[in-house]
Amino acid sequence: MSSLIHLEGVSHAFDAAHPVLDGVDFALGPGERVALLGANGSGKTTLLHVMVGLIRPRTGRVHAFGRERRAEADFVEVRAKAGLLFQDADDQLFCPTVAEDVAFGPLNLGKSKAEARDIVHATLDRLGLAPLENRVTHKLSGGQKRLVSLAAVLAMEPEALLLDEPTNALDEPTRERLMEILAGLPQAMVIVSHDREVIDRLVTRRVTLANGALT
């Protein structure tokens, strides 16, 4: 089975004395749903960011979607194929309205305005978010923002999803709704979560990051 994302010997440190990642090897195959576990501050978010080029490792190689990725131009393509759901929805949503936030990715991928509009409608309908289409994004609740963030990621039709604490700080109805949505998606996933139910219901494999090493 070929990997969608494959890390080889990845190391990174924000200061020389304390490596966050130390020779990490990791592979995500098609259809896999991998839980990335570890204590707060262990480097889980850093590892997700390495996968999509938001952080460049000091050593090691990043292979994604068939080839090694090194330059920013390489990772622009990766970020279109591996949708990263940020831990804080406010880091992801920056357009005035929900429709504009969801259309942003497809437009950047070269879709016409008409095509992007169709994608927005289809994606919001699919997630049950059509009533939010013309809402001002910053006025939404935290749970609504989280769902709109997922819609913005899915609108790019990624092959993989990298989910950073997807259910964090959600009320129970929104949390359950999000889990149902994720359970029905076909994409491979890496899920960072401390939510035991999310892990038990969604993942096919678990790995743990501790002291810079992945086991």
Across the structure, where does each feature detected by a protein language model lie?
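Helix-to-loop junction immediately C-terminal to a conserved catalytic motif
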Residues: V52
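Conserved ABC ATPase signature
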Residues: V136-L140, Q144
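Conserved ABC ATPase "signature" region
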Residues: A114-L132
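H-loop/switch region of ABC-family ATPase nucleotide-binding domains
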Residues: S193-H194
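Conserved ABC transporter NBD signature motif
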Residues: G60-R70, V78
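The feature captures the beta-strand-to-loop junction immediately N-terminal to the Walker
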Residues: L37-A39
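Catalytic Walker B motif of ABC-type/P-loop ATPase nucleotide-binding domains
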Residues: L161-D164
